[in-house]
Amino acid sequence: MKDNKIRLQKHLSECGVASRRKAEELIEQGKVKINGHVAVLGAKVDPKRDKVTVRGKTVTAVSEKVYLMLNKPRGFVTTASDELGRKNVCDLVADAGVRLFPVGRLDRDSEGLIIMTNDGEFANKLTHPSSHVNKTYRVTVKGEASEEKLLEMKEGILLDGIKTLPCDSFVAERKPDRTVLIFVLNEGRNRQIRRMCEAVGLNVIRLKRTEIAGVKLGMLPQGKWRPLNEREMRRLTNITQKKEDV
């Protein structure tokens, strides 16, 4: 007899609840149930037979996959679950007609481009460390940013005992009391740019993501969203298909 069971986190991602890694967090937090019983990491389900709920709501298959970009304002979190009741980016796309989740993360104090979708496999491939997706940030720091400090960050900074990957960093604008920098990274460690700047004595006062894998935020107003166009989708699916081929 054929076994139709798949891993629970894969089922959740295919149903548009979250990416696989975020789905694992929900399972570990005890927010997922299978047929009324709290699920554990490693559990498998038969999508046609088992009833799966997340926070009491029944999970159903995604009928149409949606992909859009959002200009995230400061003060919004991008976590799959927030016990503190803080404002969530999902609230900003509630009028999209379907439940969406963010691809990757952007700190609460940061702003700019976030991709939102209900396609868990797409999100998982795009955020996987092996994808090395380029992301561009416009970062304003207090005071002067010397070439020595920029070089140090370009070559890599030791964070939690692991050196950051080489990145591109240059001055976009100099003002009397602040410097505007551009960073291009292809990894996404927690609060990475802020911590890199802090390590060389720079204080970040504004951080905005402007581009992901060639998909640009452009003039999209803060707090607003729009569907990704055909060219943008082609750029992103090229990356996810390459990941599939590896």
Predicted regions: what is each one?
Residues 1-246:
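Basic, flexible Lys/Arg- and Gly-enriched helix-loop patches that mediate nucleic-acid binding at interfaces
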